[in-house]
């Protein structure tokens, strides 16, 4: 199970690296070719997630929750949310790159994505070596620099409404990715308790209602996963 989750984060890191290549101002003419590579990396992520999810379900079927399994569930949901955030911004990469090619903002976005990709690879290594993951403060500094750069660009190009909206959405999603990476370091037993995809038998009406109620919130990874499936 742990190896399957490690592979999921490895695929996710490769995916974020591929996304960062869209923000290279010196290779704008190569963007169409990069779309194919990006699509392949996305397919690899989906396949890795499916394998990790299957491994988790087999591990917990009919069993009480184990601390290590719960930890892997938390990591799985974090990886899924990171992928969702990174994949939810749709815009013309060529147009954005052309607009930003003479600014530092495009370099900052690329650098932030590269650091987030590296964080995913770091998580992969930690899972395989069974060592604690530590959030790299450089990722947070890169995010703060990107936000400040966007604020400056927005003031100087207030007329570019569509571009600014797309950029703000992108930065918001990258901010959410950073949050997930921080949370993995700050993981607690309370966080584990919220990540429930187990199939253990629950008896008694009171207990059933309690379990349902505890997951019927947007703070519950299980609830967000159900929305994605729907």
Where are these regions (language model features)?
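Cytosolic regulatory and coupling regions of membrane transport/channel systems
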Residues: 2-230
